[in-house]
């Protein structure tokens, strides 16, 4: 059975917004070319090997592989087969001296291949692309709400039963991800960061959750090996007295939600630092709730970040966010979009933006304690959680 396609009206609206944003950036722009599959999906509803060319009055998706699949699953108006980049020049014979591209993903190798047939100087348009994606349409919000419902169900209702004596981090993460995929989840996490990889998520026990990865995230993980700092260790197994950090994303029709939770496996009162663990948990819950109350259209991300930092208990400031300099991040087609709840982000929030809020506290000798949920900025009133509550089940008795 074929997958549900992105509606034609949605694609047309995105193309109109792209042209308006480009004209605002450069009234004299005449052409842009996108070769990244994620950008291609956003504007055409399909991910193929090819290139999307847009001018003020024309737009064509050129596909090397697979043209038939692209025609089958995309409602984009003009899709053409491409033998080589020469095919673009046959449709667009007057290539301008300057063509806008996504500089973050356009490689020198791809640019060299393009320039063999299309002699142009590239100019970056990454800010336009991230700006367009930061405000979600009704269609995109529906996808994220569906992701959030599934996410909440699996993490809050199913995951506690997966915690058992002797289960490894890797198996636990895999079982949770399988539960998501079995119910229609996407099965992948996409990132903008070059240091990030498209992976399942992480399950980390106790001090393993403090081990930093190359990804700019407070959540730590020892990984499956030195070559993969994600998912979890197949050797580290769960035992009574462990904290369990689950930071496992969910996706629905291309759109992600982010949620993390910390469990304690056993009776928390028996832990020598039970008081500190409880205090850290309560602090993170309070900080997430306060952040959610501040996430309103017109609010400034940098100001929210500074406000929340001022509320962190002095006893937890050194370990707050495990060394990371942000509190939350925009999310959508990738896990790490803009804006970010951090210094330097001064543009006001807008209705339709979606952000993950993830206060976490590193406790030496214990692990990373915290919570995370994805929120939708509404036209009026505080943000709405798409992924459930932050005050969820924490203590799981030995099964």
Segments the model singles out, each with a brief description of its role:
Residues 1-399:
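Active-site neighborhoods and metal-handling regions in enzymes and metal-associated proteins
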